């Protein structure tokens, strides 16, 4: 039996089509995925992300533990509320999960991890936290709503009290602050500005209804996927998993190689991969009729005349751009064009950086 978030009833009242998403009943859309997508790009939309897992870590050695656990370095986090995106790797350098870590005090950090990887993440974190004496609290008492779009912050702020409005005023991206019942973070998964707001489960439904009244459009998993793909953001299980190096998933920027004496899980394997080279993640654009889909082969000939094949990890029709886009994992040596096999047709595609839309504007 799939689990329900505290907002399940609100979704059905809003006319959602519900689907089982990694063991959670979640809204796929509320009538039109395209309308929901455009609302986020042009105005304000919101997503129930209560299926994600919030994990609080406490203890005097929490920073030391996270410097060992994560490929990115929490030593960068010196201002309370600052957040960091990182991979959590296994010993062979594969990605167990990608997550966000928030720093509050020297003995209090917070992780937000994916729902599909919840059990293995908690097991891995618990196993490695033990020698450091870390107290782990899974915050199943909290729901989370992501409010995203150019007008999202202004519309959400109409629900805040004076202290909350003051706390978020001028807050830069990748910060979070707890004021009263609300944990408000300037993070998201759409390529737009916005907030991800965690609040007690019993307050979530009222807050959702108030956002609807403030003109924020409910959005489902369908729009969430097309938005994150346009923004070039990875989805766990597609762009990366435990067999894929972050270097092959456009996550090289999340690896803190310095200082060289920091020993983090997976470092040794990553150094070998960096030396020998890995595949890489690229963007693909197809303006011809048709849609690029996951797992389609991508073929190209390198400068030496050698033929290579990669694979599409995520593909869709881009509502913002009006043509098909994809992320693909390919061998080194790809040029500016490639061929994608769609059924019995060989379709030409343009190779780009793995990002297509930022703040509503085309970049591909």
Curated annotation (Swiss-Prot):
One of the protein's GO biological processes: glycine decarboxylation via glycine cleavage system
Tagged with keyword Transferase: yes
Pfam families according to UniProt: GCV_T (PF01571), GCV_T_C (PF08669)
Gene Ontology CC annotations of this record: cytosol; glycine cleavage complex
EC numbers: 2.1.2.10
Molecular function terms, GO-annotated: aminomethyltransferase activity; transaminase activity
UniProtKB keywords: Aminotransferase, Transferase
Catalytic activity from the UniProt record: N(6)-[(R)-S(8)-aminomethyldihydrolipoyl]-L-lysyl-[protein] + (6S)-5,6,7,8-tetrahydrofolate = N(6)-[(R)-dihydrolipoyl]-L-lysyl-[protein] + (6R)-5,10-methylene-5,6,7,8-tetrahydrofolate + NH4(+)
Ribosomal protein in keyword set: no
Assembly and binders: The glycine cleavage system is composed of four proteins: P, T, L and H.
Alphabetical list of PANTHER family matching this protein: AMINOMETHYLTRANSFERASE, AMINOMETHYLTRANSFERASE, MITOCHONDRIAL
Family under the similarity heading: Belongs to the GcvT family.
Alphabetized HAMAP family for the sequence: GcvT (MF_00259)
Its biological purpose: The glycine cleavage system catalyzes the degradation of glycine.
This protein's name: Aminomethyltransferase
Organism: Shigella flexneri
